[in-house]
Amino acid sequence: MRKLVAAALIGVMTMGLTVCGASAADFDSSEDITVVSREDGSGTRGAFIELFGIQEEQDGEKVDMTTDEANITNSTSVMMTTVADDEYAIGYISLGSLDDSVKAVKIDGAEATVDDINDGTYKIFRPFNIAIKGDVSDAAQDFINYIMSKDGQAVVEENKYIAVGEPEDYTSNGAEGKVIVAGSSSVSPVMQKLKEAYEKVNDKVEIEIQTSDSTTGMQNTIDGICDIGMASRELKDSETEAGLTATVIANDGIAVVVNNDNPIDELTSDQIKSVFTGETTTWADLEK
């Protein structure tokens, strides 16, 4: 049975799982691997299972083959806390969100870095999209113009993401008002940085960011609940058929992360697939 990891329980789990003085020397490779995945609807999960082949074609439909034993987390931050608190855990997050609370493993010999993505050696990355439905307000359009400008793409690069396009100088259209941006918890951190930078050059527009997941963000945009949706994946056919238009605002790597006390520093793509489909269940199995 899948286990939902609720943010409210993290503090309790931390007290129960933390071992004083734990280190790589104390790591018991015979222990079961704690597989940690994102929830259904997460764009990061969708990109992850596609990039590692953790899906199968069944009756014309793509089926997610993530093990039923996976712990399910509902955001990037909960994923990171869960892996940081469990010595035997493995998960995956946006590269732009990576910090020293967890350790990113090399994949097929390549490091999860912007440089390795740019030179083609690290192949686990996906687009960050924003989406709109039809015409948007002048305020929403002005914010989009800023995101895609030289200034906006500089913010993208400063925060460990990969800039896109051939940006031009930003010129405000003089808009005023409020813009609601909703969706992916992976896109949300860079969107927050873009909001902060934008409001310094146009304080007449208020940007509100609502963090959930990619699918919810797209549905909210379709329903007119928000002005701009955020997705950490390509849009689905059903979403574009509902009237959404996507724009890539950045590219982002997906880092496979383990606890800092885990001595493993590198895995192959096949090993990661084996772990997340439940074929490999202990850390010792990865050493064979």
Describe every region a protein language model picked out.
Residues 4, 21-288:
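Exported/periplasmic ABC-transporter solute-binding proteins
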